[in-house]
Amino acid sequence: MLLNRLRRVNEKNRNEFLGIFLHRYPAFVWSDAEPDDIPAFVFHDVTPEALKPLLEYLTENRYTTLTADEYVERASTGEHGAKREVLLTFDDSHESLYSVAYPLLQRYGQKAVAYVVPGRIENSRTSGTFPLCNWPQIREMNRTGVIDIQSHSMFHHSIPISSCVVDFVRPGLNFSFLNGDFAPVREKESIQESGFVPFGYPIHDWGARMREAPAYMENTGVINTCIDYVASRGGEEFFRMPGGRRTLRAVLKDSRLRNPPGRFENEDEQRIAMLEDFIASKREIERQLPGKNVRHYCFPWFRGSRLASALSFEAGYVSNAWGSLVSSTMRYSEEKIWHITRLPCRYIFRLPGRGRRGLSRVLTHRA
């Protein structure tokens, strides 16, 4: 699981290196050039200390912020409504979207797009399992027009992509879907959605649902053997025993010999699972926000595929938001979808304007 986190850090750093030093980022990042296209920037969890200077910079230099529809219209036609326009996006709908970003955007007369995960959002104003906005807060932000609510998948869940078991459900495990390391699946449905996962449940090597890799489905007999073995030996207490996980791996191996093998989902199952997720997230947001037309989708972890893009178009989306680099295999003319590449928010300070920061200083700014 630590290895998965290191992989994500390495992937992020690699993309940033390629973007800057191989000049794959927009020219304004690594030179004094004006932006050729409308720049898009991505935020996640924010603090007032980090966000306020960025919004001040945009406002003082007369930048106009756009909704997702406005961005795609401008980008696809090449006709800008103003000389200086940018797209600000917030992923995951952290609680700070409402408590920090929303009031600051109002103060500076700016707006942003929020890609939310409707299957994770609570209905009440009390805190949920994770520090996310709730539906009353999202309705308020949407109603004012300051925040344009769009889709970030139904559950932001990951899937097992191999038979390799990297861990077991145990005390102290980080269950946050934002962490992404926890990816057990029972047939088509992620067990993460149930709210309860028994100790001993095998955790496989994981990947993003919208990538090319199909989900691996472990034999349920093997899963239940591991769960029952832990439960019969004290549950939580089992993992305090020396060599507990090593013993459980031996149980897993033996059970696999005595049960039919697990399998990967086939192409039809993969396609259906992806399409259902696209449709479900769109419908749920539109149900919660009457009158809202959800047309824009952001890939969790910035990880998608040509199949996913094609299916998102089939589900009614017109754009896909990624990270800073999108595969060269993604072409608007082929996919019929607009691909939005987004830079880390600190690169706002590289936009032309009074108080523009040097690249070396921006690279050390971790907003």
Q: Can you say where each PLM-predicted feature lies in the sequence?
A:
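Histidine-centered divalent metal-coordination motifs
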Residues: 44, 152, 156
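Structural detector of well-ordered beta-strand residues that form the stable sheet scaffold
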Residues: 66, 113-115, 150, 321-322
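Acidic (Asp/Glu)-rich catalytic clusters
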Residues: 55, 59-60, 79, 102-109, ...
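A short alpha/beta connector and helix-capping loop motif
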Residues: 98-119
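Short, catalytically relevant binding-site loops at active-site mouths
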Residues: 119-121, 155-158, 303-304
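C-terminal active-site subregion of NodB/CE4 polysaccharide deacetylases
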Residues: 1-89, 95-96, 161-163, 171-367
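Short active-site segment of divalent metal-dependent hydrolases/proteases
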Residues: 94-95, 155
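Short, flexible/disordered intra-domain loops and linkers
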Residues: 123-131, 163
